[in-house]
């Protein structure tokens, strides 16, 4: 029966970029099943144990503040700005909506490689 598979539950797949290096990012899924419009999701993802490649420092905690805007299978939400003392990860955050199956496929695919040119070297 469609929708009964654990892999088909609605989730938000959040990617937070932690530095200019595209490999320095954290992927996290949030189960949004049964959440009603107006619901605020607040989660803090603890620091990642490995060091970031670009800055050679441990990754910071990531704050997720999402407000659900619609209900149903593929939900919509938006970032909610708060005055939480835990520093936000940045500068980029990408939110994709789908299912656990989508998240599994996304996490299995390799990160895109970006080339940063050093203009001082020529």
Curated annotation (Swiss-Prot):
This is Non-virion protein. It comes from the Viruses. Belongs to the novirhabdovirus NV protein family. It comes from Snakehead rhabdovirus (SHRV). Plays an essential role for the viral pathogenicity. Residues 80-122 are annotated as: Disordered.
């Amino acid at each position: 029966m469609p929708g009964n598979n654990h892999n088909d539950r609605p989730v938000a797949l959040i990617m937070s970029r932690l530095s200019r290096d595209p490999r320095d990012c954290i992927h996290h899924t949030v189960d949004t099943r049964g959440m009603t419009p107006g619901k605020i999701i607040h989660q803090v993802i603890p620091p990642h144990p490995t060091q970031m490649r670009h800055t050679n420092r441990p990754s910071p905690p990531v704050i997720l503040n999402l407000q659900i805007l619609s209900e149903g299978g593929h939900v919509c939400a938006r970032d909610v700005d708060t005055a939480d003392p835990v520093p936000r990860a940045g500068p980029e955050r990408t939110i994709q909506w789908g299912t656990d199956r989508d998240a599994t496929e996304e996490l299995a695919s390799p990160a895109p490689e970006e080339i940063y040119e050093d203009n001082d070297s020529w």
